[in-house]
């Protein structure tokens, strides 16, 4: 190997290095998805959407995240009120747009 070959050797492109680093960061963020602030925020948003269409109590919604062998499962249990006789089957509130 002569001196010029030393300076000409192929370096890994910076784009490849950046891509590898980004993949590592994303993998760490995905691993932290079951953090304590994730589920309460998700439950709050789901509750707001459900309340647009059905009058329910806050304590009637349960959100649970389970992880098994590389697979994540989100379980949402909503206890809906009994239907009232003669009530129209339309959303409780509609957005005017």
Curated annotation (Swiss-Prot):
Role summary: Prevents the cell division inhibition by proteins MinC and MinD at internal division sites while permitting inhibition at polar sites. This ensures cell division at the proper site by restricting the formation of a division septum at the midpoint of the long axis of the cell.
Protein name, entry field: Cell division topological specificity factor
Gene giving rise to this polypeptide: minE
NCBIfam families xrefs: minE, PRK00296.1
Keyword Glycosyltransferase: no
Keywords: Cell cycle, Cell division
Pfam families in alphabetical order: MinE
Matches recorded under InterPro entries: MinE (IPR005527), MinE_sf (IPR036707)
Biological process per Gene Ontology, one example term: regulation of division septum assembly
Claim: Phosphoprotein is one of the keywords in the record: no
Organism: Rhodospirillum centenum (strain ATCC 51521 / SW)
Gene3D superfamilies, per database record: Cell division topological specificity factor MinE (3.30.1070.10)
Family stated for the protein in its record: Belongs to the MinE family.
